[in-house]
Every structure is written in structure tokens, then in C-alpha cells.
Amino acid sequence: MLKIFNTATSKKEIFKPIKNKKINLYVCGVTVYDFCHIGHARTFVVFDMIVRYLRLIGFQVKYIRNITDIDDKIILKSLKEKIDISAFTNIMIKEMNKDFSLLGISPPDEEPRVTNYIIDIIKVIEKLIKNKNAYVNDHGDVIFSINSDKFYGTLSRQSLDKLISGTRISIDKEKKNSSDFILWKKSKKEEKFSWNSPWGKGRPGWHIECTAITNVFFKDYIDIHGGGSDLLFPHHENEISQSRCLNKNFRVKFWMHSGLVIIKNQKMSKSLGNSFFLKDVLEKYEAEVLRFFFLSTHYRHPIYYTEENLKKSEMSLEYLYVTLYGTKPIFDPIEGVNFEIDFFEALNDDFNTPQAFSILFKLARKINYLKKIDLSKSNFFAFRLQKLAGYLGFLLNTSQYFLQKKLPFDEEIIKKIESLIEKRNFARKSKLWKEADKLRDKLIKLNVILEDLPEKTLWRFKR
């Protein structure tokens, strides 16, 4: 029985979709004004894992993740780079997809770009004005009135006064309330990036985009709405308020939020100048290591981004690959099934990946024990380990590929190593221990790690 922590109620609840086994799932996507950073990676690895698991246990998931391809930062960046805005956003989206693909993040079922839904956004704004939830100010901007929604502030579970004091909200004399927000921003005369509307040329505000897109794809309900915890207020609060005012029958059953990335005891933020581009991190660490790192912490908790923690993840993942090294995974319906039961129990408890990881490492210890006494039996458990880890999106490569990747390959050195191992094995069988030790020392100098099993000796380069 799957339980999910619901931000709206601040508790774990048994998950039941609104309609049978079909799930409407929406995650706020990237504003493509620059390369993706590790905060993006954390959020989308988490929701990739969640979607994979929901499908694994039998749900039909309709997964939508938007792309914001128009806003002030995008306009400024394209002008700075002296490149057409659509060409610029296409480049950024291509880079985003490349990074996400390396991390094993499967694409959503639909990835709507905001600029393709301007007409839908205008229709939504027109209805909000008609319902007296929005007004046009003297500048010609369309503004949402938070006072028109008596439930405003309930999602983030704070009083409006606290929400205002705890958030950077600009005070504008053109607003009836300082925390009212823009739905449609009227363009200045010199601005090129605008669309015609009943209120003159302009472009949409950020919050209205998700409301309009979810209205197109989901109409009356979303089973799971996700995003980073930094979006809870004001973005998600504003979004759900707009959606309620647009459609009184609209509901989100579960709100899910992933934790922040912490760097040197501060949340990662471009405004603080402490963010890391994902592409730069991927030059130093393999994508599988980074995915492992993100899932090693519970999705709701903050994750501490340090070189030490990345190295720990690299070593942990290497341990699992070393465990599989030398095995030939074979399915058995009985062996290791208890590990699988425990693994599913962990993920059914609000996607508890740290607990699921602990099951994988228990399984690895079992395999390493069996490799020394019954290699053929270890193959059954190796199959189970590979299968369960695969559900989370790792251990998808061969051990040989992972362990030797990025290491120099020289055919002559390989031949020399295998010759030394053969001589050492002969010396051991002949009980020529001193000779065997000398040969082992030569192999160590060649950066070789040996693993002696009853039937054979495995070797690999030290990474």
C-alpha cells in the first residue's frame, strides 16, 4: 500500500488516484535562460524515480512537465548573447535534454512550451477578469487579486502576513494589495518579445503559465503536483489560487515537494552565486554517480552537496558494481525474494530511497559472502540486485564497463596482467607462497586489484 507525504495536509496519506489506476501528474519545469544546475537535476531525478515506480506498480501515469521559454531573464540573456530568442531557448532546451538523458531522466509524456500556449493563457486571464479575480491597472498590466480567493495561503499553511514578510515581494502602487501578482505584463514600446491581447501587446506572468497548461492537459484535477520546495510559495500558492478561481471543481489531490540542495550551509541559489551547472559536474563525475547521490537522501530532505558526499556516492556505487563483478545474473523465483519484498515496502513508504538503498547493500553483502562459497548461487542474488537497482535507474551498465571506464586501455598491459595472474595462480596451486606474493606485488604496482574466488581470480584496475 503506497503512502505519500502530502504537503497540503503535512502528513503521509494512502495514495489513491482520483480515477482508478490513471494518474495525472504535473511537475513545474525549467525556465531555460541558462544551463541546468544541480538543483534542477535533484528535482527531476526525484520525479523520474517516482514516475518509474508508479508505473512499475501498475499505474497509468500521464506525466506533464512544462518549459518556460519566455521571461525577463530569457530576454536579457538572448539580447546579451545577440541571438534570436527562439534560437537561444532551443539551444538551452537541447542542452537540458542532453544533461537529463545522461542522468537517466526519461522525458515526460508531454513537455509543453509556454510560447505555444499564449492563446490558452489569454483565455484563462479573460475568465479571471470576468470572475472579478483579476483587474487591469493603470499601466495596462493584468493583476491577480489575492483577496478574491478566500482560500489563498492555505497550501503553504501560513497566514498571509507571514507569507508576505517571509518572501521577496515588490511593493507596487499599481496593485490593490502589495502581494497581488502579474498575470499579463504589458510590453514597453521598444520591446520586441510580445503577443497581441485584449489588453495590448505583452507577455504572460510566470504563475499563470502552469495554470493555463494544466487546464489544457488535465481540466478538473491533478493527482500529483510536484516541484522543488522553493516553489511552494509563492509559485504553487499562486498557481492553485488561480486554478480554483478559474474552475471551482479543480483540485490537486497530492502536492509533493523535493528538498533543497545545500552548499556550505546555504541553499543553492543563483542569486547567492553558489550554484553549479550540471554539465560541469558531469565532466567530473559520471552521471550514474550523480543520480545515486540524489537518491541516497530522502526526496523531501535537503541534500548536502559536497565533494566528500559525491566521493562517498562514487565509492558506494563502485562497491555494488564490484559485487556484481564476476557473477552471471540468473533469475530464480525464490532466491532473494525477501529482499525484493523489503525493497518495495521501503518505496511504498513515501518513496523512501535511503531505506531501499540499505536493502540493496544487504543484498550485496549476501552476494559477496556467496561468491566465496557458492558462486553459482550468488548469480541468483546478483540478478535480484541488478533488477531492484534498475528500478531506481542505476546498475544498468556491466561491471566491466563501469569499473574500467575513464581508465587507460593498453592491450599490451592487459596481456601482461593476465600473464602475471596466470603465473600467480600456478604458484598458489603449487604452494609457492613467496613467489605468489612477489607476483601479487607486481600486479599492485600496475594498479590492479585482485579478488580470489574458489574457482577463479577476478581482477580490475583501481579507479
Swiss-Prot record:
<keyword id="KW-0479">Metal-binding</keyword>
<dbReference type="GO" id="GO:0006423">
    <property type="term" value="P:cysteinyl-tRNA aminoacylation"/>
</dbReference>
<dbReference type="Pfam" id="PF01406">
    <property type="entry name" value="tRNA-synt_1e"/>
</dbReference>
<dbReference type="GO" id="GO:0008270">
    <property type="term" value="F:zinc ion binding"/>
</dbReference>
<dbReference type="InterPro" id="IPR056411">
    <property type="entry name" value="CysS_C"/>
</dbReference>
<feature type="short sequence motif" description="'KMSKS' region">
    <location>
        <begin position="267"/>
        <end position="271"/>
    </location>
</feature>
<keyword id="KW-0067">ATP-binding</keyword>
<keyword id="KW-0436">Ligase</keyword>
<protein>
    <recommendedName>
        <fullName>Cysteine--tRNA ligase</fullName>
        <ecNumber>6.1.1.16</ecNumber>
    </recommendedName>
</protein>
<dbReference type="InterPro" id="IPR009080">
    <property type="entry name" value="tRNAsynth_Ia_anticodon-bd"/>
</dbReference>
<dbReference type="GO" id="GO:0005829">
    <property type="term" value="C:cytosol"/>
</dbReference>
<dbReference type="Pfam" id="PF23493">
    <property type="entry name" value="CysS_C"/>
</dbReference>
<comment type="similarity">
    <text>Belongs to the class-I aminoacyl-tRNA synthetase family.</text>
</comment>
<feature type="binding site">
    <location>
        <position position="270"/>
    </location>
    <ligand>
        <name>ATP</name>
    </ligand>
</feature>
<dbReference type="GO" id="GO:0004817">
    <property type="term" value="F:cysteine-tRNA ligase activity"/>
</dbReference>
<dbReference type="Pfam" id="PF09190">
    <property type="entry name" value="DALR_2"/>
</dbReference>
<dbReference type="InterPro" id="IPR014729">
    <property type="entry name" value="Rossmann-like_a/b/a_fold"/>
</dbReference>
<keyword id="KW-0648">Protein biosynthesis</keyword>
<dbReference type="GO" id="GO:0005524">
    <property type="term" value="F:ATP binding"/>
</dbReference>
<feature type="binding site">
    <location>
        <position position="210"/>
    </location>
    <ligand>
        <name>Zn(2+)</name>
    </ligand>
</feature>
<dbReference type="InterPro" id="IPR024909">
    <property type="entry name" value="Cys-tRNA/MSH_ligase"/>
</dbReference>
<comment type="subunit">
    <text>Monomer.</text>
</comment>
<keyword id="KW-0030">Aminoacyl-tRNA synthetase</keyword>
<feature type="binding site">
    <location>
        <position position="235"/>
    </location>
    <ligand>
        <name>Zn(2+)</name>
    </ligand>
</feature>
<dbReference type="InterPro" id="IPR015273">
    <property type="entry name" value="Cys-tRNA-synt_Ia_DALR"/>
</dbReference>
<keyword id="KW-0963">Cytoplasm</keyword>
<feature type="short sequence motif" description="'HIGH' region">
    <location>
        <begin position="30"/>
        <end position="40"/>
    </location>
</feature>
<feature type="binding site">
    <location>
        <position position="28"/>
    </location>
    <ligand>
        <name>Zn(2+)</name>
    </ligand>
</feature>
<feature type="binding site">
    <location>
        <position position="239"/>
    </location>
    <ligand>
        <name>Zn(2+)</name>
    </ligand>
</feature>
<dbReference type="InterPro" id="IPR015803">
    <property type="entry name" value="Cys-tRNA-ligase"/>
</dbReference>
<keyword id="KW-0547">Nucleotide-binding</keyword>
<keyword id="KW-0862">Zinc</keyword>
<dbReference type="InterPro" id="IPR032678">
    <property type="entry name" value="tRNA-synt_1_cat_dom"/>
</dbReference>
